[in-house]
Amino acid sequence: MDYAIYTEGLTKSYGAVRAVDSVNLRVCRGEIYGFLGLNGAGKTTTIRTLLGMIHPTAGRVEVLGQTVTRNGRGPWRQVGHLVEAPAVYPELTVREHLEMARRLHNLSDPKATARVIDQLGLAIYADRKAGTLSMGNLQRLGLARALLHEPALLILDEPANGLDPAGVVEIRELLQRLAHERGVTIFMSSHILTEVDRLATRIGIIHQGRLIEELEAKQVETLRTRRLEIQTRDLTTARSILTNAAYGSVITQGASLTLSDPRAVEAPDEIARLLVNAGAPPTHLAVVQENLEEHFLQLIGAV
C-alpha cells in the first residue's frame, strides 16, 4: 500500500504526560482524512510530529514515503501545511506575503501568487496589510501559502477556523476539488464535525492521546441508526404495551422511550394507534437519527 502518511507507535511525552500514545496512522494517497478529537486530545501534537516541528519520544513517522528525521529531512517541497493561527508580518500586504513565500519555494512562475489569491477569494484584500485582516481572512492567507507550491499533501489544523458559514463552504468545495481533480491528499483536524462528515473519506478519532476509532465514509453512513422517540404521560404502560407487542428492545431515556425496530421506525402511525388504544396516547412521536457528533460524544464518553 502506498501511504501518504504512515506512523508506527507514534508517541510524544512531556514529562509523565503522554500527549500522543502509540498512534498508528495509515493515510492513503488521494484521500481526505478527518482527524477528530477534543481540545487537548493530541491532534495538534500529532500534526506537529508529522511535519517534523517536534520530535516524537518514540515511534516512526513517514510522509510521502520518506522518514521524518531529527535533521529536518523530509518531502517538504511536496507538503503544504497550516497549523493553528497563521504567522504573518502585520505591515506586509497579502500579495507581499505570498510573493515572499513564492521566492522561498523557489517558484519561477510569477502567476502562482495570482492563482492562490483567486483560489482563496483574496482579490479584494490582496493589497491590504495583514495586520488589518479579519481572523477569517488571515486563515485564507494561511491556506493560500499552503497551496502556493501545488503540494501533493496538505496537512491542515482547523482549516475552517475563523471563517463565516459561506467561507466554510468555499473551503470545503476547494478541498474537494483538490482531492478529486488533482489527487491531493488532505489530512485535516477539525472540531466542526458536520464539515468533517461532509468532506472526509475516512475519519480517525483521537482521545487522551490514543487513536480509538477509524471510520470509512460508508461506515459513518451505517452508524446513523434511525429510531423512534416516544413521549407519553404513562411511560410504564407504554413500555409494557410495546414490549408485549414484540417491538424489540424498548429503551427508557429520561422522559422518553426509544425503539430501533425497523417496523416501528417505518410505521410510527401503528405505534400511535397501539398506544392510544391502550390508554397511553403519545404526546410526542418522532423518527430521529444519530449523526457523527452524537456518535463521537458517545464514543469518548465510553472510553
What is each residue range found by the language model?
Residues 172-262:
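ABC transporter nucleotide-binding domain
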Residues 60, 227, 281-284:
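Residues at or immediately flanking beta-strands
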